Regions:
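Generic preference for hydrophobic/aromatic residues in regular secondary structure cores
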Residues: 1, 21-29, 112-119, 131, ...
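Extracellular/periplasmic periplasmic-binding protein-like sensory domains
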Residues: 1-69, 149-153, 164, 168-175
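Short coil/turn linker and secondary-structure boundary residues
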Residues: 7, 85-88, 160, 174
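Segments of small-molecule ligand-sensing domains
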Residues: 51-62, 73-146
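Conserved C-terminal helix/tail region of periplasmic/extracytoplasmic solute-binding proteins
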Residues: 97-106, 135-178
Length: 178
């Protein structure tokens, strides 16, 4: 079983049939024909402006790229709304990132229905995001989600992370910021 960064097509295709049944964690499904994918096909690929094979827009790493762009876009949108500005500063955009809350309605609005809610704060840059598990089908060359959303174990993991961060800061003479 791999974690989320070892669960893309690039990780399994080179292994061919030997990768069949491989499982990995993920924070999003792949391969779905979402409204956003339909728009990308219509407004980009159908107009001859796409780079690469259109079928790759369904792959794990492409979707992660989409998510990064969505988070940046939503940070700017949050900052615009909160500060009442058209072009937010870097500090205002940081506020937008640190106060992001993507609800089911927000995911629907951006064309990715079914994605898990994410709420980011200064104290929690992870967003409290649950995880899915997926299995690779080598013959179909596709991932299948094989679990429901599994919540993070914050009560177990967070104290260990904070203790390790404090130890590292002390060893390296770093003053932690609030």
């Amino acid at each position: 079983i791999g974690n989320w960064w070892s669960g893309s097509e690039n990780d399994v295709l080179p292994a061919g049939a030997a990768a069949d049944g491989y499982r990995s964690a993920t924070f999003h499904a792949s391969g779905a024909e979402t409204p956003l994918h339909k728009d990308i096909k219509k407004y980009v690929y159908d107009k001859g402006k796409g780079a690469g094979d259109v079928d790759r827009i369904y792959e794990v790493l492409y979707i992660r790229g989409l998510l990064n762009h969505i988070f940046a876009m939503e940070a700017v949108r949050n900052a615009q709304e909160h500060f009442g500005v058209k072009v937010p500063s870097g500090e205002q955009t940081r506020w937008g990132l640190e106060n992001m809350h993507m609800t089911a309605a927000d995911w629907e609005r951006v064309g990715l229905p079914g994605f898990a809610e994410i709420k980011v704060t200064c104290e929690d840059h992870e967003g409290g995001h649950p995880v899915l598990f997926q299995r690779w089908d080598a013959s179909a060359k596709s991932w299948t989600v094989i679990s429901d959303w599994i919540p993070v174990m914050r009560d177990v993991v967070r104290p260990m992370m904070e203790a390790d961060a404090a130890k590292y800061a002390a060893e390296n003479n770093i003053t932690p910021r609030d």
